[in-house]
From Swiss-Prot:
Localization per Swiss-Prot or TrEMBL: Cytoplasm
SUPFAM superfamilies (UniProt xref): Nucleic acid-binding proteins, Translation proteins SH3-like domain
GO biological process, one term: peptide biosynthetic process
InterPro entries: Elong-fact-P_C (IPR015365), NA-bd_OB-fold (IPR012340), Rib_uL2_dom2 (IPR014722), Transl_elong_fac_P/YeiP (IPR020599), Transl_elong_KOW-like (IPR013185), Transl_elong_P/YeiP_cen (IPR001059), Transl_elong_P/YeiP_CS (IPR013852), Transl_elongation_fac_P (IPR011768)
Protein family per UniProt: Belongs to the elongation factor P family.
Top-level lineage group: Bacteria
Any Pfam family hit: EFP
Pathway: Protein biosynthesis; polypeptide chain elongation
Name of the gene: efp1
Protein name: Elongation factor P 1
A cellular component annotation (GO) from this entry: cytoplasm
Chain's role: Involved in peptide bond synthesis. Stimulates efficient translation and peptide-bond synthesis on native or reconstituted 70S ribosomes in vitro. Probably functions indirectly by altering the affinity of the ribosome for aminoacyl-tRNA, thus increasing their reactivity as acceptors for peptidyl transferase.
CDD domains: S1_EF-P_repeat_1, S1_EF-P_repeat_2
The organism's taxonomic lineage, starting at the top: Bacteria, Bacillati, Bacillota, Bacilli, Lactobacillales
Source organism of this protein record: Lactobacillus johnsonii (strain CNCM I-12250 / La1 / NCC 533)
MF term (GO), any: translation elongation factor activity
Amino acid sequence: MQAIELKKGMIFNQDGKLIEVLKSNHHKPGKGNTVMQMDLRDVMSGAVVHKTMRPSEKVDLVNVSLKKAQYLYDDDTDFIFMDTDTYEQYLIPKEHLASEAKFLMPNIEVDLKFTDEGKLIGINLPSTVKMTVKETQPEIKGATAAGGGKPATMDTGLVVTVPDFIKEGEELIIGTENGDYKGRADSITR
């Protein structure tokens, strides 16, 4: 496969390491050839790097299979998930899910990602999650919905910019793509 075909979420093998594509953009500088600018994450270490590749550069795509699972809890070193069909439990080291951790709520359904060899390499989050506002500033009289918003700390520690009318204790829908506010949980039907 060529680098130009890589899309977000795909995993390829580079120098014996599994690399996940976080973002991929075509870029045509004023002079010169088109290049691919990508944000890549080492699946095992969690390290994220920005890399520029030629569109024709060859990559070795890794086949990934998915299994439905439920997030149960975490301990000092791992996140624990349960296969919803077999009830088998899987442990993933916390450092491997650094960016996903802030969206993990007990009982949330995720997809576990496995290589063809059966190696667990990560998770796919749902597109949105329901979270509760743990801490935010009180509503300001006269604030409008068109205002810039205010920071709110969710029950996982994630900080989200929310409209001024949001209060502590409210349940919100949060996008997992970039941690943005989607709406109140009671006003959005999924």
